[in-house]
Amino acid sequence: MPPKKVPTSKTSSTPVKSKGTTTKPAAKKADSQKAEAAAAAAAPPPMPPVTTISMKALGRLTEEANSKDPKKWPLVIDLQGNVATFFRYRDANVLQAELPGDLDADKLRRALLGALRFGKPLVLDMGSHDIREVEMVNDVEKNLLDSLLDKTLLDDERYLTLVKDQDEKEYHNSAYYATDRFSFVVITTNPSPNTLIAARMTCFQVE
């Protein structure tokens, strides 16, 4: 008699899929966190604290700003529109956004160099304009606004890169500069200025 065949198992050789948790929820959570982080990065920073200051105290504006944060220049919220006139009487280099051509690249460059050389304030009176328009400073030199706002422009005579061949010879020599007395001020009549700039400055409001 022929030998009996041993019956083979009919179980499929295909592996059984695990019914455990999948990675999809974790991936969705990670994507959600990335989206939230991107949204937070895109959102404007909050308005920084605003200190009230009198017109009389504006003569000490730079000192007041330095006492709060020595790495920041002052932003003045001027609802009455008198602060620019105050600075003109103090021999500052005042440029007005309201005047056509006043913020042209070469005029800005010369006003900045003059303020650095003679140790005077450079004042950008933005009036009712969006103060983010101060970014036109970058038309003078790439990333100039960053180095101006964080004061690194004053380090290692970096400001000399702004000097052109046609400028007077005194501008080519750092010995003729009084940068220790230089200051930078932005004025706005907007009670709620753009925080992309305001957050990088020390904010005051004239009472």
What is each residue range found by the language model?
Residues 24-207:
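Conformational switch/transducer regions in large eukaryotic molecular machines and scaffolds
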Residues 7-8, 12, 16, 21-22, ...:
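Low-complexity, polybasic segments enriched for Lys interleaved with small residues
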